[in-house]
Amino acid sequence: MGDRRRGRWPTEGRLEQMHRERYAGVAVDPVPLTAGEEVTVLYQGLLAEKGAEQVWLHVGYGPADRWENVTDYAMEKTGWGWVKKLRVEDTGRFNFCFHDNANNWDNNGGLNWSYE
Protein backbone atom coordinates (compact mmCIF):
# COMPACT_ATOMS: atom_id res chain seq x y z
CA MET A 1 0.00 0.00 0.00
CA GLY A 2 2.86 2.37 0.80
CA ASP A 3 2.60 6.08 1.40
CA ARG A 4 -1.02 7.03 0.83
CA ARG A 5 0.05 10.48 -0.32
CA ARG A 6 1.81 8.99 -3.34
CA GLY A 7 0.11 7.70 -6.41
CA ARG A 8 -1.14 8.58 -9.82
CA TRP A 9 -3.97 10.74 -8.51
CA PRO A 10 -2.96 14.37 -9.08
CA THR A 11 -5.50 15.47 -6.48
CA GLU A 12 -4.17 13.47 -3.52
CA GLY A 13 -4.92 16.40 -1.21
CA ARG A 14 -8.52 16.36 -2.41
CA LEU A 15 -8.76 12.58 -1.85
CA GLU A 16 -7.58 13.12 1.73
CA GLN A 17 -10.23 15.79 2.25
CA MET A 18 -12.92 13.54 0.70
CA HIS A 19 -11.74 10.74 3.01
CA ARG A 20 -12.30 12.94 6.07
CA GLU A 21 -15.71 14.22 4.88
CA ARG A 22 -17.18 10.90 3.76
CA TYR A 23 -20.78 10.02 4.52
CA ALA A 24 -21.59 6.34 4.95
CA GLY A 25 -18.26 5.51 3.34
CA VAL A 26 -18.94 7.45 0.13
CA ALA A 27 -17.78 10.86 -1.11
CA VAL A 28 -18.43 12.51 -4.49
CA ASP A 29 -16.58 15.56 -5.83
CA PRO A 30 -17.42 18.03 -7.20
CA VAL A 31 -21.06 18.62 -6.39
CA PRO A 32 -23.34 19.70 -7.88
CA LEU A 33 -22.68 17.40 -10.83
CA THR A 34 -22.63 18.74 -14.38
CA ALA A 35 -23.25 16.56 -17.44
CA GLY A 36 -20.10 16.29 -19.54
CA GLU A 37 -17.79 17.05 -16.60
CA GLU A 38 -15.65 14.64 -14.59
CA VAL A 39 -16.60 13.50 -11.12
CA THR A 40 -14.54 11.54 -8.58
CA VAL A 41 -16.22 8.89 -6.42
CA LEU A 42 -14.40 7.70 -3.29
CA TYR A 43 -15.68 4.52 -1.62
CA GLN A 44 -14.68 3.27 1.84
CA GLY A 45 -17.88 1.42 2.72
CA LEU A 46 -18.77 -2.10 3.75
CA LEU A 47 -17.13 -3.92 0.82
CA ALA A 48 -13.86 -2.06 1.38
CA GLU A 49 -14.02 -2.73 5.12
CA LYS A 50 -14.53 -6.45 4.44
CA GLY A 51 -11.37 -6.60 2.30
CA ALA A 52 -12.76 -6.80 -1.24
CA GLU A 53 -10.10 -7.66 -3.80
CA GLN A 54 -11.82 -5.46 -6.41
CA VAL A 55 -14.70 -3.00 -6.20
CA TRP A 56 -16.84 -1.81 -9.10
CA LEU A 57 -18.88 1.38 -9.27
CA HIS A 58 -22.30 0.52 -10.74
CA VAL A 59 -23.76 3.67 -12.37
CA GLY A 60 -27.03 4.50 -14.10
CA TYR A 61 -29.02 7.61 -14.96
CA GLY A 62 -32.68 8.53 -14.61
CA PRO A 63 -35.41 7.76 -12.07
CA ALA A 64 -34.40 5.73 -9.02
CA ASP A 65 -36.59 2.81 -10.12
CA ARG A 66 -35.64 2.84 -13.84
CA TRP A 67 -31.91 3.29 -14.36
CA GLU A 68 -30.73 3.80 -17.94
CA ASN A 69 -27.27 3.67 -19.53
CA VAL A 70 -26.09 1.35 -16.73
CA THR A 71 -22.33 0.78 -16.63
CA ASP A 72 -19.88 -0.88 -14.24
CA TYR A 73 -16.52 0.83 -13.70
CA ALA A 74 -13.56 -0.90 -12.04
CA MET A 75 -12.34 1.27 -9.19
CA GLU A 76 -8.71 1.78 -8.21
CA LYS A 77 -7.57 0.93 -4.69
CA THR A 78 -5.65 3.80 -3.08
CA GLY A 79 -4.51 4.53 0.43
CA TRP A 80 -7.66 6.61 0.86
CA GLY A 81 -10.10 3.97 -0.38
CA TRP A 82 -11.45 2.82 -3.73
CA VAL A 83 -11.56 5.64 -6.29
CA LYS A 84 -13.03 6.16 -9.74
CA LYS A 85 -12.96 9.30 -11.86
CA LEU A 86 -15.53 9.33 -14.66
CA ARG A 87 -17.39 11.69 -16.95
CA VAL A 88 -21.04 12.34 -16.10
CA GLU A 89 -22.70 11.19 -19.33
CA ASP A 90 -26.30 12.27 -18.82
CA THR A 91 -28.35 15.17 -17.45
CA GLY A 92 -30.64 12.79 -15.53
CA ARG A 93 -30.26 11.72 -11.93
CA PHE A 94 -26.83 10.11 -11.31
CA ASN A 95 -27.52 6.82 -9.47
CA PHE A 96 -24.86 4.47 -8.18
CA CYS A 97 -23.95 1.63 -5.85
CA PHE A 98 -21.02 -0.76 -5.53
CA HIS A 99 -20.22 -4.46 -5.88
CA ASP A 100 -17.13 -6.59 -5.38
CA ASN A 101 -15.46 -9.54 -7.09
CA ALA A 102 -17.55 -12.01 -5.02
CA ASN A 103 -20.82 -10.37 -6.21
CA ASN A 104 -21.52 -8.77 -2.82
CA TRP A 105 -23.34 -5.44 -3.16
CA ASP A 106 -23.40 -2.23 -1.15
CA ASN A 107 -26.53 -0.39 -2.24
CA ASN A 108 -26.97 1.85 0.80
CA GLY A 109 -29.58 -0.39 2.40
CA GLY A 110 -31.54 -0.64 -0.86
CA LEU A 111 -31.64 3.12 -1.42
CA ASN A 112 -28.50 3.38 -3.57
CA TRP A 113 -26.83 6.79 -3.81
CA SER A 114 -27.94 9.52 -6.19
CA TYR A 115 -27.32 13.11 -7.20
CA GLU A 116 -29.54 15.34 -9.33
Model-predicted regions and their roles:
Residues 1-11:
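Long, contiguous interaction/targeting segments characteristic
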Residues 12, 16-53, 61:
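A structural signal for beta-rich interaction modules in eukaryotic proteins
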Residues 48-90, 101-116:
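Aromatic-rich carbohydrate-binding modules that target alpha-glucans
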